[in-house]
Amino acid sequence: PKTLDLMDKPVIAMVNGVAVGAGMGMALQCDLRIASEEAKFSTGYVKVGLVPGDGDAFFLPRLVGIAKALELLWTGDFVEAREAERLGIVNKVVPAGDLRQYTGELARRIADGPQIAIRMMKRVAYQSLRLDVRTHLDLVSSHMAVVRETEDHKEGVQAFKEKRPPKFTGR
C-alpha cells in the first residue's frame, strides 16, 4: 500500500475478472478504477479468518461509507461490476472488449494534461480527507501560487483565448 500511496502521478486500475482480497485491495489503492462488465469484487478475508492487511479496510469505507464497507468486509460477498460502479468502488464499467482501449484513452487524456497541476490536484484531494475546510483552502491557495507560474498555465490561458486545445509540456 505504501508504494501507491507515495506516487504523485495518477494511478489507474484496470479490472477484468475477479478481484478478491489483495487483488481488490490493490485496485482500491489506485486513484481510478475501470472495470469490465465481467469484473467481480470481494474483500474475501472473512472467508479465511483474516483481517484485511492490504488497505481494504482503509480505502473501502472512504469509497462506500462505513456501513457498506463493514457489510462487505464482514460477509465477503461478491459485488458485480455494475453494483461496484453504483457504490463508487469503480469509476466506470465498460464491455470487456473495450476495457484496454477505454482505459488507455483515459490515461492518455490525463497524461496530456498539465502534469504539475494534476499532481497537485491529487495531493490536495487526498489531503482534504484529513483536513478541515479552512486548512484545505489555505493549502489549495499555496499550490495555486505555484501552478500560476508554470508554462502549462500560461499555455492553457493562451489556448483558451485562442479557442484551441492546449498543448501542455509538463513545465
Predicted features by range, described:
Residues 135:
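Conserved "HGTGT" condensation-loop signature of ketosynthase/thiolase-family condensing enzymes
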